[in-house]
């Protein structure tokens, strides 16, 4: 989740000026193109790991315990954490950045907290499925999920563009609850399968891993120039959009699995640094997005080079994000709002 800070800081300097705050002085295709590959797999990797961890919890705890944990760790941060940090951004923006309160809609409230909506929806699906079902799932359900995540995803985009024409808050809710869910559930599903088939991870040959890596890189090489608008690899018709979606699923899914495979075999669970990074992740993820926007505006000086501006923005975003975490974890009401576990008392 932490690599998102690098991506959002780079998005401020994007030549496409599509981010919430786009610098009028600093535009760098070279920098944006350097960071862009991580954008193609980071959320897919996140949901793959989330599916694995969800099934691990369900295998050890009852469904009631699992659901209560999801309400505390996912729904509460969505309702309170997102509301809090994005409200502060709105206040800051209304004073300094010409934000209008009339535009403080559902998207402004949730913004980058959309992944929490996906997690709570996926947790709801887990609650509906029998416990341990992923240990018994065959090929057909896997194909069905893959088809929904590819053909279904493209169909939803096509129907909305051609028939539904959803706009405003309705479009935002549609994207957050349905479109993103269909987009990322195949990876959550794959992570859930991995939990019950961990024995197969030990039998994967080095040759298979190399082939998967090569396949993922080839797919990435097709997506990369198209996403950066360097060369139109795929057409804008429905067949081109579907092909692009399939290639992206191959690229992001392969890289997500390879990352999972690597860290699965690196046993560092006892490291204090790793525990700290895990415990702070939700706070860093929720606060860095508005911080990038505010700091991007505050630091935007034409006297700085693109590299200086980016590095300053990146470093200060990390510093203030972790300062926020240190403050949040020390205040009970803020710990609750961000879904953190209670602090353990220190014994002398």
Model-assigned labels for residue ranges:
Residues 1-348:
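Alpha-helical transmembrane segments and their immediate juxtamembrane cytosolic regions
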């Amino acid at each position: 989740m932490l690599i998102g800070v690098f991506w959002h800081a780079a998005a401020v300097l994007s030549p496409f000026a599509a981010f919430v705050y786009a610098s009028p002085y600093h535009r760098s295709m070279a920098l944006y193109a350097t960071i862009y590959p991580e954008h193609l797999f980071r959320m897919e990797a996140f949901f793959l790991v989330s599916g694995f961890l969800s099934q691990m919890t369900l295998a050890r705890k009852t469904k009631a315990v699992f659901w209560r944990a999801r309400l505390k760790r996912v729904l509460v941060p969505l309702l309170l954490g997102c509301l809090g940090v994005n409200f502060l951004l709105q206040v800051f923006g209304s004073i300094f950045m010409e934000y209008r309160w009339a535009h403080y809609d559902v998207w402004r409230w949730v913004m980058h907290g959309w992944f929490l909506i996906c997690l709570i929806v996926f947790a709801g699906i887990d609650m509906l499925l029998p416990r341990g079902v992923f240990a018994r799932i065959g090929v057909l359900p896997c194909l069905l999920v893959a088809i929904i995540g590819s053909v279904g995803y493209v169909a939803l985009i096509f129907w909305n563009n051609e028939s539904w024409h959803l706009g405003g808050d309705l479009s935002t809710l549609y994207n957050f609850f349905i479109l993103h869910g269909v987009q990322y559930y195949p990876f959550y599903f794959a992570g859930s399968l991995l939990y019950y088939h961990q024995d197969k991870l030990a039998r994967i040959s080095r040759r298979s891993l190399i082939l998967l890596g090569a396949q993922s890189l080839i797919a990435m090489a097709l997506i990369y120039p198209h996403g950066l608008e360097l060369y139109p690899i795929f057409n804008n018709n429905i067949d081109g959009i579907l092909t692009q979606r399939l290639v992206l699923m191959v690229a992001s899914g392969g890289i997500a699995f390879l990352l999972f495979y690597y860290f699965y075999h690196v046993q560092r669970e006892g490291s204090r640094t790793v525990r700290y990074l895990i415990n702070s992740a939700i706070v860093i993820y929720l606060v860095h997005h508005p911080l990038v926007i505010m700091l991007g505006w505050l630091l935007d000086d034409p006297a700085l080079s693109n590299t200086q501006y980016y590095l300053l923005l990146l470093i200060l975003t990390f510093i203030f994000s972790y300062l926020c975490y240190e403050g949040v974890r020390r205040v009970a009401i803020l710990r609750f709002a961000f879904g953190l576990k209670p602090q353990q008392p220190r014994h002398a």
